[in-house]
């Protein structure tokens, strides 16, 4: 998220996956998937982003193939894959399975609940969308990783739908920016910069 995507890929290319044990191979494919996903999001164009997304999906398929079937991680990534293929109702089922027994202070909880929020937004269920965004935002705070994507989305949702709560939306977004700056998370800072002006202007 600091912008060193090509360097990350180059480092991964130095690894011979045939020498990895099962657990390390999971981390290997997950790192590739994440790097290409973030690179595509960072590029946000019509030339390079589609190429990176294609690579991301290839490594996502590889990751799913090596995860233990029925595990929380396997169900989560199946949900992600189905979501990306616009099979939202099926994605919801896998996300819900992935959430079973996962405590709020585990990173996977935030990932799954954020995925569920996105699914419900596609299904037009805005109450559930907000419900799971809040769950994801709470988990982000419990896990000290300085990741506040859910809080950003919640701020924007409040701004657009709660005319009397602009100050709360502004507070959430400011908090997200502080965390992004703390970790020099350029991707999140760019995202916030796009949303930030309209909320700040409304608040002033």
Each PLM stretch: what is its role?
Residues 1-203:
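A "functional boundary" signal
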